[in-house]
Amino acid sequence: HCLGREDEIPEMGDFFTAQLLNEPLLVVRGEEGIVRVMANVCRHRGMPLAEGRGNTKRFVCSYHAWTYGHDGALLRAPRMQNAGFDVKGCRLPEHKVQLWNGFIYVTLDPDEPDFEHPELDALLSPYETGSFRLVHMAEEEWHTNWKCLVENFMEGYHLSVVHPRTLHGYTPTGLSRKLVNGDGYTSYAANYPDSIEPRGHGASGLSDEERKRSTLFAKFPTQVASQAASLLVSLS
């Protein structure tokens, strides 16, 4: 599952919180720039350790002041020294993270292998997707099946019918072309007509053809994105 972009937490101690399948998550950049995703739950009485986003030197539980480092290690548990409690043996559960093209992905399955999408990597490489920076973010919760988002986003067939005065003029149904697909992903090109200018110049390695289209991809089950020359939009 895609949680966001690496540049949301550029500095050591930057963090944001998220929820995945009723699991409260804490996404933090720690020492040496390492990005971790941990359980956002104190090991003592289950209180949330953080809310929203920000920057902090330590995560301190608001209930009993148990204190954790950026790596999830318990640093302090007040008045527990006489209870036979091993502070060094306690830490926040950590989930498996993979960074790809500037995105942060997490899985709750520790045995899930890292994904590899060489054909999709080759498709996005000229755009330098990993170098894009977040300029706007909006949060909504949709009570729907994940396939509704993916199936609607990943086809241009409906554009002429549903969006005749907006998207169809920029990315006509008739110019949509299927691109690469593989295990866990698919993609297509929304090509612009000759009358439409590219969306910015973009990276120096882009061809004229790549500047004249939006490259859309889906990483199943929960992420869809549109990459243009100077614009990247992602939903997850």
Mark where each language-model region is.
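Residue-level detector of functional hotspots within protein domains
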Residues: 4, 47, 60, 83, ...
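Extracytoplasmic c-type cytochrome modules immediately beyond a signal peptide or single-pass transmembrane anchor
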Residues: 1-7
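C-terminal catalytic domain of Rieske-type non-heme iron oxygenases
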Residues: 40, 98-99, 103-105, 109-236
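Rieske [2Fe-2S] iron-sulfur-binding domain
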Residues: 8-110, 117-122
